[in-house]
Amino acid sequence: MKTVEIRQQFLDFFEEHGHTVLPSSSLVPADDPTLLFTNAGMVQFKRVFLGEKDIGTNRAATSQKCVRAGGKHNDLEEVGRTARHLTFFEMLGNFSFGDYFKKDAIRFAWDLVTGRYGLDPERIFATVHHSDDEAAELWADDVGIPTERLFRLGDKDNFWQMADTGPCGPCSELHYDMREERTGPLTVDEFVELAEGGEIVEIWNLVFMQYDRDDQGELHPLPAPCVDTGAGLERLAAVMQGVDSVFHTDCFRPLLDRVAELVDQPYDPKLEASVGYRVLADHARAVAFLLADGVFPSSDGRGYVLRRILRRAVRHAYLLGRHEPTLVDVVDAVIDTMGDAYPDLVTRREHLLTTTRAEEERFLATIEGGMERFEELASGESGTIPGDEAFKLYDTFGFPLDLTELMAEERGYTVDVEGFEHALEEQRRRSRADRAASQPGLERGADDEEGWVVLSPVAQDFVGYELLQVKTGVRAFKVDGDRVGLRLRQNPFYVESGGQVSDTGGVSGNGWKLTVSEVTKVGNETAVWGTVEGAFPADPTEPLEVEARVAATRRDTVRNHTATHLLHAALREVLGEHVVQRGSLVAPDRLRFDFAHTGPMTSEERTRVEQIVNEAIWADHPVEIDHRAHADAVSAGAMALFGEKYGDEVRVVNIPGVSMELCGGTHARSTGRIGLFRLVSESGVAAGVRRVEALTGRGAFEYMVAKEDALAEAASVLRTTP
């Protein structure tokens, strides 16, 4: 049976048994920005299992895209060297949310594998948790598995938990005996040894979530037990197609054939070089699906894992004699073979191929120098690669640490990882020092919590979302040379965050005025800094009554910040959903937006982006701001930055039908208040990162007038018409 048929038969079977077939969720988890990638079928249902979300059905079935590379679940190191490890795979699963439990789940699994799939029941083993008498009895009495093929195992193999606390429970696994010669009953130890050796293959895991583990480790029965099952599609295909490796199934054969065509050597699994073929085939699938789901190669987070996968593939192609882009052609084969099941691969083909080729070319430009340096470092029979040298391979030649470790292991070497981390931290320290030097206020301790004279115990309240002018009191002050810092009880001044610059303005007291030139964070509060005109009280003991006024330029900043959200949405619409923010500057006089993209925008793309933003402005959409639970906001489609630390409750800036982002900045009440938007430049700032600068409102109008004046002047000199 072909892989596509195995997938469809699974979904059809469970649909016939009352399950709602749901689409795979994205590889980028919607409800959990701290999780690198979707790595199991249950990820999209996590909040359903926790009772926090209702999806309108209590039975579901899916074929879920999964990636295990980076983080807790990381199969990257094993890919190509074993018969079953993959970075990208599909997980078939059926789920019960408080509906059926062990009896039906076990019966469904048995009927599908022995009936519709036609697997030999005499070759099937079942395992249960040593404490799960109920499951053991169901396998033995209800299904009829003999005791010699039913094993009780411990927590490591047969107990599952979502986290240290919360829903958990025993699991039961189905295994298939792939041996040609079977010699009789097995002991538990023999079974485990054969399973670890790949001769007996796990094909399905049934998790019975029946307990809630508290923070003391105690288990309490759940009021509505659930079922979460997972069967690796590729592993199941290997069993049903009678092959000894997932790479020899019909879903990988076209990819291995493409690699063989590119390197001009047939694939021979007996040769050591065959590892490279398998790595290229696997990594091409991971790259294609990650790019299609909006992940973009970068230097951190998900993007860095993708870059590591790409560069591992380039290195294997290089060892196979390919010194030109190779993975891009295998990605193209992935699109051809899997595009029917996943149409996004086809619609985003150009982006997938362009990005893959660009990343390959970038690493190929430095790989030779890096390989030569590595050869010098690992010229003996064994030894250690110094940490500072591993860092140079990373920083100068683009070799991820795990790639250097892999190369070292192949030579019998180790890498001084601690030394690498020290060199990396030193670079970060220098970067922080450079940033501090460029911010003299911070360098002088403007963010230091010491030295403040506290006049009021009342905590500060930020009122800057609603008010630009407020009468309030000074709750603390600090004199630092010729500068004075004030912490106001009610503070209208925005402190630089999320790309938006700090406010300026003034604070007036009885006979004195402070001109605000800098705003900083001091603990959880905000301080305004500046020079004082007049006589600031020498030794106040009670809160000083003042009037704080934010400069009118805040209105321009507000326009630019809302325009930045419109720009982000327009770039994603025109260039693709791989576009994500890499940095921004929101100032009164301009806005700057850095984003992930491979190459320069065409003039047509720039014009289209401008048009989309201006149409949104002229439509005068309301800008809605509310606070929600983080998971609810992300589930509703709000854009969140991976790696950003968000609280349980987040601030959502929503322009209905146009944009929804998590954002703490200040915004216009409606898009119409922006007035006008104009792109003024577009350039590259780093590998795979583009930058656009733009103007809004009066600034955009004045820019256009200046351009027209310059054009008219040039036409006059040339005695022609513009």
What is each of the regions a protein language model found here?
Residues M1-P722:
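A glycine- and charged-residue-rich anion-binding loop/surface
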